[in-house]
Amino acid sequence: MKHIITVSILFILSLLQTIQAKGKDEYWYTPKASPEERKESFLKYYAEHGRKDFLTGIFNQIARVAIGQPMEDEPTYKAVALVRSNRDCNDFSINGMLRLLYMDREKTVIPAHLKKEIEACVLDFKYWWDDGRRDTTYRCYHTENHQALYHTAELLAGQLYKDRIFTNGMNGVQHVQHAKERLERWLDFRFRFGFSEWLSTYYEVEAMLLANLYDYAEDEAIRKKAGMVLDLLMFDMALNNFEGMMGSTSGRMYAHSLINGSHNTSPLTKLMFGVGTFDRDEVMAPIALSTSKYQCPKVIQEIAIDYQRPMLNR
């Protein structure tokens, strides 16, 4: 038993040292800047220090173009290759690519040679399990966040390329219709019943896709519902965070996310509420919201940092 306790203590100390060594961003326990200043600070921080590979690599490129820096070829090609590999969770990356494409419509930020690759990737993507093409690797479609990731990506892709024929034979208009029916149900269920993955690390994912819908969905009802559900999610985090940590129950969580000095949503709480740290790889929501029209209601921001009043949440 002593041996087990000793090993456990050493593991925790090692983990804490790793966290401290990695940290390039100050952990805030109280807000020190306005929401707009935090957005600017985060984009600059992540453009310089953010991860350029794996599932969230394309979001580093969003941060770069948002502050006026050029996109980089190699990380973008890696992101395209990852999506085309048909691996699980490539729906994270495709949503980042779509935000880039919509940003490019407002102001040219994607070089022509990279845009060609990204567009081909979007037109070829498998947007739902009923697409007749067989998956070559396991892909999760059914969990709460993945459902909406796929439907959001399909809606935004269909809107962009209404008259184009996708690899699966459907045109953009058909993809919009296919996604819209499923998205409306998902949004209605979240507002009526809340999240089955309540207070989980996946709020970071869901805040990102909701921001994409809020900014770019052409259907006014979907935009409005996305904003309402995003307010609901922010209120949930405001009630249950403590100085940027979600020390609550959750509908889904991995051990490595619990045994840590910060939480997957800590960059999001720092951006929205001014408490937490930007020093994590889970930044899809902060990137999306730093480049979004969405504004978190002031009353929710005030609730988020009111730690003086005891609260029982059932």
Residue ranges and their predicted role:
Residues 40-217:
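Aromatic-lined, polymer-binding surfaces characteristic
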